[in-house]
């Protein structure tokens, strides 16, 4: 039979499909990391147009670079902060935004390719086709959210909306989570052809939501530059909460608009996220899991240390990027631990 021939009957290959989707998940992890670098280097507004196809090709000569630079000069961010910027400086920030968009296109192409080949080879197990279509649709929506975020910084603001930034990050992690959970389901199916997809327990759902809130708060911290408000730990300056830090006029909007309050909540909500993740790890251990338990525990320690280091270094870019990267790895470990909670306990 030709390698291009379509099988006459379904030929599910859950392990092979899991490997390919794991690759896509790794690419999503990479784009989240690059997105963090893009934000921290103030590169996100360097490309002021949305060209899904033509935008694949970067400027190739001096005239094209100058045209792109002129586009950037028209937005408020340039006038407010970058009047001194040279063309070489512009190329540096353009690089990260371009790589971020190129990775996004690459992820879409790889996922589409995997879906098409798996469909043609009839290798998608029953019940997984619509799930993969849903993940691909989320990817398309994420592209629109990305442009919606960038657009917020092109006319009046000198930076993107931190609310839209958080939406963009959470959408990326929703895609990442769907991929990781699907990979785990497919691995289970490969071990046992009669296995059903795992059902997330209330504990696992609660822990993931608590961690998602903490990651969202981290996006608020980045978007509001709240990490620069206080570079001390555990106190904020000389106080646990600075006098006058809560703006009475803002009311509950302090929780997402006030840099001091956002940093404070992000500091202490971290402990709720850690406790919830450890509760899942403990439950997983009772069901015989070892790898995910160690992964969750180790990553919690590393993540807390990186969070403190991010503050104490005055938001050093390398440390802050590592902090964001480990947040995604912790989410993956939490999903791994939570995936097996529908199994009976080991006596």
UniProtKB/Swiss-Prot annotation:
The chain crosses the membrane at residues 17-37, 106-126, 132-152, 165-185, 202-222, 260-280, 295-315, 317-337. Its cofactor is heme b. It catalyses: Fe(II)-heme o + 2 A + H2O = Fe(II)-heme a + 2 AH2. GO terms for molecular function: metal ion binding; oxidoreductase activity, acting on NAD(P)H, heme protein as acceptor. Heme binds at residues 266, 323. GO terms for biological process: heme A biosynthetic process. Pfam families: COX15-CtaA (PF02628). Its EC number is 1.17.99.9. It is a multi-pass membrane protein. It is found in: Cell membrane. Keywords: Cell membrane, Heme biosynthesis, Iron, Membrane, Metal-binding, Oxidoreductase, Transmembrane, Transmembrane helix. Pathway: Porphyrin-containing compound metabolism; heme A biosynthesis; heme A from heme O: step 1/1. One of its GO terms (cellular component) is plasma membrane. Interacts with CtaB. Belongs to the COX15/CtaA family. Type 2 subfamily. Catalyzes the conversion of heme O to heme A by two successive hydroxylations of the methyl group at C8. The first hydroxylation forms heme I, the second hydroxylation results in an unstable dihydroxymethyl group, which spontaneously dehydrates, resulting in the formyl group of heme A. HAMAP family: HemeA_synth_type2. This is Heme A synthase. The gene is ctaA.
